């Protein structure tokens, strides 16, 4: 299989998963499953089926997949050329070698699952269920790969759109329209660093409110005024409260070290107001870098033609529209909390319900096995 996979990789190039797109993927999956059933029923008659049965085959196939998976993890998957690229190791999921071994491994598990189900009276129920569920995951992963779509869509607040960019860079029309209603962003409290020799110190202090104080290096720093939303007129160093687009965080601090005392404003700035630092007598400065983002959320309206739904989309909290999931993947970093654009990754995986069902079966089989073992111990 290694020789065949390498030869196909060198002569044909990477595997084109789009060839398995609906309906061909389902047709091939059905025929593949039928072939495995034939193998299970005729393994004693067909000698060549020994390549899919037996303990030695299980161990060999599993070991091969483990080795390839380790290579998958160690080699950067950037599609680079050269020797590694020619052999498919820099793009393993589209490598002939990897996919041939994966198909063989799935076939071994598939035949074993069918055997377990045929001899359910002689097999542990949870073992049969676990093998079958694992096979379903592999089947969906292989034959459903052509149906997976990833489309990146950038929306501007108030402007509905359904045109995104696919992985191949082509513009793609989505079966739904997204309109960004509002964007919100939550940040961690400001960090104050010492800036010297064009570098920020690793050591820092956190200021949350007026009256906070801490020591940074040799300087004792006290917050005299804290403005979450502030602005500064051009040419002025005084920050005033401002609830308007572009408002930034500004802190008035007093820094003391021995007989040296300085006061002034520190700000991280925004896309409108430049940041400001406090000059210290020793040539260093107190500076506030851009605040770290804690979480961000987009309130959107999604229209499918038949209905309109509202969603709050955040990282790890996607919206679901039919077979599509809409993930929050970015925003206008320059504008930060004042971003008027959101970037979404729209992912379609028609085989995902089968995968989810299989994972629940694995969980159920594990729980059943746990209680079954406890019952046996009690009987003994």
Model-derived features: positions:
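Solvent-exposed, non-transmembrane regions of integral membrane proteins
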Residues: 1-380
């Amino acid at each position: 299989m290694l020789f065949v996979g390498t030869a196909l990789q060198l002569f044909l190039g990477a595997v084109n998963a789009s060839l398995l797109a609906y309906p061909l993927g389902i047709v091939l999956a059905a025929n593949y499953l039928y072939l495995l059933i034939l193998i299970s029923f005729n393994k004693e008659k067909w000698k060549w089926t020994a390549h899919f049965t037996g303990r030695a085959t299980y161990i060999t196939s599993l070991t091969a997949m483990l080795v390839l998976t380790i290579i998958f993890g160690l080699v950067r998957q950037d599609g680079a050329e050269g020797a590694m690229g020619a052999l498919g190791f820099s793009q393993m999921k589209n490598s002939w070698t990897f996919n041939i071994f994966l198909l063989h491994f799935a076939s071994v598990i598939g035949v074993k699952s069918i055997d377990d189900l045929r001899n359910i009276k002689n097999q542990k129920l949870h073992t049969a269920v676990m093998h079958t569920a694992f096979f379903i995951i592999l089947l969906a992963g292989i034959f459903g790969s052509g149906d997976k779509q990833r489309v990146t869509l950038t929306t501007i607040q108030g402007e509905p759109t359904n045109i995104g960019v696919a992985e191949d860079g082509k513009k793609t029309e989505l079966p739904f329209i997204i309109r960004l209603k509002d964007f919100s962003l939550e940040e961690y409290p400001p960090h104050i660093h010492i800036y010297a020799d064009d570098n920020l110190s690793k050591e820092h202090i956190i200021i949350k409110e007026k009256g906070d104080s801490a020591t940074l290096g040799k300087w004792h720093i006290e917050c005299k005024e804290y403005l979450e939303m502030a602005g500064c007129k051009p040419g002025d160093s005084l920050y005033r409260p401002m609830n308007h687009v572009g408002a930034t965080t500004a802190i008035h601090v007093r820094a003391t070290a021995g007989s040296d005392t300085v006061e002034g404003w520190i700000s991280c700035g925004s896309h409108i107001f430049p940041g400001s630092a406090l000059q210290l007598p020793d040539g260093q400065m107190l500076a506030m870098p851009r605040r770290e983002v804690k979480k961000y959320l987009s309130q959107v309206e999604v229209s499918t033609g038949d209905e309109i739904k509202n969603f709050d989309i955040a990282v790890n909290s996607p919206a679901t529209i039919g077979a599509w999931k809409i993930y929050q993947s970015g925003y206008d970093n320059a504008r930060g909390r004042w971003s008027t654009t959101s970037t979404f990754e729209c992912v379609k995986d028609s085989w995902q319900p089968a995968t989810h069902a299989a994972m629940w079966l694995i969980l159920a089989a594990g729980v059943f096995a746990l209680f079954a073992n406890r019952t046996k111990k009690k009987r003994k």
